[in-house]
């Protein structure tokens, strides 16, 4: 009898779990913005649910995975400097028993690029980030983007 109950409980748990969508508390987008006559920036924007946050790019030795970006090299452009982030705020995170830099509500990261031609092309990028609230952290996630640079992608 106990065995039947255990099997039934396991099956019902699996069915119930499989119907719930995965937790998703951050929505990202990546776009190219022309800023000058020779190039522009890739803007990575995160929209973050209330009571959730993501971490700054600043590495820490206390636990959270910092947000990181990868841009696949191409003959069409060159990176100028590193990815810059808008102001993160410092917050005590009980899960790590430390103060860390986080973003709440929205985060914007920018990577400057110099165009090597004026044709249309796509920039392949990826980012890794970790989402947490006051109770739990979700496993780190990696997203990939194809960012379109239109023909004549520099600002006139």
Language-model-detected regions and their locations in the chain:
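Extracellular/lumen-exposed scaffold segments
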Residues: 19-156
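Sec-dependent N-terminal signal peptides
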Residues: 4-14
């Amino acid at each position: 009898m106990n065995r039947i109950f255990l099997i039934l409980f396991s099956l019902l748990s699996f069915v119930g779990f499989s119907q719930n969508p995965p937790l998703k508390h951050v929505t990202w987008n990546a776009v190219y913005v022309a800023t000058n006559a020779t190039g522009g920036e890739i803007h990575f924007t995160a929209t973050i649910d209330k009571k959730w946050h993501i971490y700054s790019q600043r590495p820490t030795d206390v636990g959270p995975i910092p947000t990181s970006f990868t841009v696949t090299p191409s003959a069409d452009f060159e990176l100028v400097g590193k990815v810059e982030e808008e102001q993160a705020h410092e917050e005590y995170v009980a899960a790590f028993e430390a103060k860390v830099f986080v973003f709440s509500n929205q985060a914007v990261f920018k990577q400057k690029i110099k165009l090597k031609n004026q044709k249309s092309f796509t920039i392949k990028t990826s980012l890794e980030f970790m989402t947490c609230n006051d109770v739990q952290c979700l496993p780190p996630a990696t997203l990939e983007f194809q960012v379109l640079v239109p023909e004549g992608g520099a600002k006139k």
